[in-house]
Amino acid sequence: MKTYKTSVLVSMMLGIFSTTAFSATVPAGTKLSDTQVFRQNTHSDPGSLDPQLVQENTAAQIVIDLFEGLIWLDENGQVQPAQAEKWTVSDDGKIYTFSLRDAKWSDGAPVTAKDFVLGWQRAVDPKFGSPNANYLTKAHILNAEEVMQGKMPLNELGIKALNDRQVEVTLTQATPYFLQLLAYPTTFPVPHHKLAQFGDKWATAQNIVSNGAYQLKQWTINEKITAERNPLYWNDKNTLINTSEYLFQESLASAYQRYQAKELDLTWVPVEQIPHIQKHTPDALIVVPRLTTEFYTFNVAKPPFDNEKVRKALYLTLDRPLIAEHIIGLRKPAATLTPPEVDGFSAPNIAELNQPLTDRVKQAKKLLNEAGYNEKNPLQFEIFYNKYATHEKVALALASEWKKQLGADVKLRTMEWKTYLGERNVGNFQLSRMSIDAEYNEPSAFLNSLLSTSPENVGQWKNKKFDQIMKDAQSTLNDKTRADLYQQAEQLIAEQAPLIPIFYSPLIKVINPAVGGFPMHNPQDYVYTKELYIRK
């Protein structure tokens, strides 16, 4: 059995070389501002602050400040101990035993193993309806699939409290990326005493307590959330930012204006402003590689995209370099759903995408003709996306390209984030904008979204061959075999076109140069405010 804890030797085994696992690391000689307030744009109101209900990254950013799981990911994406101060792993890699710190909720109640068990059980409880119900199946938690489907009771899930301070997790197979998965809110604890008192309303502004570095101070709907340091956080003494504000500014242009007016310290960048920033304030621009794919998914349960030939025609005629490199900029054209940089992935050669666009257009027109579409009966459909300047540019480019190349009649429909999510999740669309920000660094973080049983499979493409490929990939212990299977999965996506990969997107933002400690090498886009500080 292997034991992991916070020590120099074991930290080196984990790829962590700092003896201080938790603190805002301030270089010697740095003068700190008297006002340690960090203000970031998180786009829109979170759907919920309940860890098991989080489904958008902007909400997750707030939740990872308010709450803390068993581990966290440092600036290099490496696993660090969090609520668990150490853990052991069985020799077969299937059983993890976590020893918890003497930690407290913000109301003084102790954080117990029961809190983690309840959190994980809620995630797969079919009566609760978590949008990430399949998350624990990705980690191969024992009986997660069966519990999620209502075939087994909650207490059969592979997590149990050995005592108040020990959590035992059982997997169905050794999973190299298991610990990485524990950084996402779905695996965070919930306060069992608050759950007993308020039920699922425990996470409202009036009732919420948290176990992270920050606690909720105020939630002004459609404006901002303000959080302040949690004095009961186990490592509060090493936290420097006193107040963290999350502003809801959907307009990139307006957010950038607020940044220029020094009302924001961190926000996304309007595409048209990037050249100006690169020329005049390059130190303010941050471009961090991350594991993110922007794509459009077809609803294969509705015409016209229940026809594979129609889907394939659009897939072939998209000018990815034009959109990624010129219309949007600083993005990489995507040929596969999984980015090439993902660990354990060797991107297949999608030969047809290497053909000249003119040849692909000819092939696409032939497919449309076979499907019954021509100049007299043009293809008609609707593009659906959430309101956001970049998404608007992409949608307009798609409509323009398909009109130009195929004579398609394309309409646009856009909605605010929450409404868009609701419509998308119930399948009220024909072709919808989507993106995946990997929760862990492995191809299944992307490909699992297309499993027939996945709640993320809103396009309803169901393919038994794909499901079997993914099952085989997850069960093999041979890295080469697994990589080959992932290639096969991507080839099948290219053949049947349930979606159209468009580009891989880095994190592109402007930051107040006075902010220190920002993670520049975490490809999973985790930014913990407790690691930041403000210089004078």
Region spans (language model):
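Extracytoplasmic/peripheral linker and loop segments enriched in polar/acidic and small residues
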Residues: 26, 31, 160, 357-358, ...
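N-terminal lobe/hinge region of extracytoplasmic solute-binding protein
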Residues: 41-91, 209-210
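Gly/Pro-rich hinge or "lid" segments in bacterial periplasmic/extracellular proteins
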Residues: 78, 145, 150, 154-156, ...
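Alpha-helical secondary-structure segments
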Residues: 113-119, 164-170, 212-213, 240-243, ...
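Extracellular/periplasmic solute-recognition and catalytic clefts
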Residues: 217-228, 245-302, 325
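Ligand/substrate-recognition segments at binding pockets and active sites
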Residues: 221, 361, 365-438, 479, ...
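Structural transition elements
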Residues: 332-370, 388-393
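Long beta-strand-rich cores associated with HINT superfamily self-processing modules
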Residues: 509-536
